[in-house]
């Protein structure tokens, strides 16, 4: 009799779910999290040209976080300009869209940081011989999204390295626009997150070549409402869980982001 009871207890223990991460009551009730995304930044988030479905590192990370939390991720496509207003007004619970954690944004949102990243110069491969090192960029036209922190970082780098011959910054509507202007010869070089370049170089073989290394350290974060402390902690716990069980590293490797991973989740590490 005792042996049978013990066996039953062991089976029940084996089948019991892992300790659940505590969710805010409203999230626990609706069993979903509304997440804003701007799918135009491969490999972070984009629409698969063959299927028109959302894909990318952020999409797969978001779905993995949802499984850890036991909720559905309800993706809400929007423009970049509307992401912060959406989190402020509560139209979405989170933003997971390759967003840089900046101190200037932390009054509006709290960031759970999941990548260590930074801007990197690149040029057309056909002009690689002109740009053997980054100092060759001095005096040249360099394009980057005006909505990011890249303009500030480019100006800082130029001030330090281009005495009397500064980079001529050209603001673009986004990274895709910067690449278009690069191909058209309207800019000599472009800047975007270094984590995105390996994917782009695979997507368009022979098109681009990086110049130098990442020239500033940034963190990419999942943005949440400043007052949503319980959800912030839940996301931290879920991300740490993915890091611990190896799922996070698997996703990094799949999307060629291994060199940009973090060892643990942090909050508002951006400057």
Model-derived segments and spans:
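Acidic, polar ligand-binding/catalytic clefts
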Residues: 63, 67, 72-136
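Ligand-binding clefts/hinges and TM-proximal coupling segments of bilobed small-molecule sensing domains
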Residues: 21-23, 149-169, 210, 240-271
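A ligand-binding cleft/hinge motif common to bilobed small-molecule-binding domains
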Residues: 81-85, 98-106, 153-156, 181-183, ...
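Ligand-binding cleft/hinge of the Venus flytrap
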Residues: 47-48, 63-69, 150-171, 201-205
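Short helix-initiation/N-cap motifs at beta->coil->alpha
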Residues: 59, 75-85, 129-130, 168-180, ...
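Short glycine-rich His-centered loop
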Residues: 30-55
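Periplasmic-binding protein-like
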Residues: 39, 116-123, 201-240, 257-271
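Extended ligand-binding regions for polar small-molecule ligands
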Residues: 59-68, 127-128, 135-149, 221-260
């Amino acid at each position: 009799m005792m042996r049978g009871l013990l066996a039953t207890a062991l089976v029940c223990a084996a089948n019991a779910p892992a300790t659940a991460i505590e969710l805010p009551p409203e999230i626990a009730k609706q069993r979903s999290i509304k997440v804003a995304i701007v799918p135009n930044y491969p490999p972070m988030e984009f629409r698969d040209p063959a299927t028109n479905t959302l894909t990318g590192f952020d999409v797969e990370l978001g779905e993995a976080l949802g499984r850890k939390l036991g909720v559905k991720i309800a993706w809400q496509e929007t423009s970049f300009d509307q992401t912060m207003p959406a989190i402020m007004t509560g139209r979405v619970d989170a933003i997971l869209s390759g967003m840089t954690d900046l101190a200037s944004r932390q009054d509006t949102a709290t960031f759970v940081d999941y990548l260590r990243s930074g801007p990197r110069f690149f040029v057309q491969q056909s002009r690689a011989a002109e740009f053997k090192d980054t100092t060759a960029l001095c005096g040249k036209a360099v394009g980057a999204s005006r909505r990011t922190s890249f303009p500030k970082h480019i100006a800082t780098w130029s001030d330090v390295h281009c005495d009397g011959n500064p980079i001529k910054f050209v603001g673009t509507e986004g990274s895709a626009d910067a690449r278009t202007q690069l191909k058209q010869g309207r800019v000599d070089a472009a800047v975007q997150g270094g984590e995105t370049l390996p994917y782009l170089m695979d997507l368009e073989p022979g098109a681009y070549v990086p110049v130098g290394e990442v020239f500033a350290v940034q963190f990419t974060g999942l943005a949440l409402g400043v007052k949503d402390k319980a959800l912030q902690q839940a996301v931290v716990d879920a991300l740490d869980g993915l890091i611990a069980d190896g799922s996070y590293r698997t996703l990094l490797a799949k999307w060629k982001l291994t060199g940009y991973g973090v060892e643990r989740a942090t909050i508002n590490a951006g400057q």
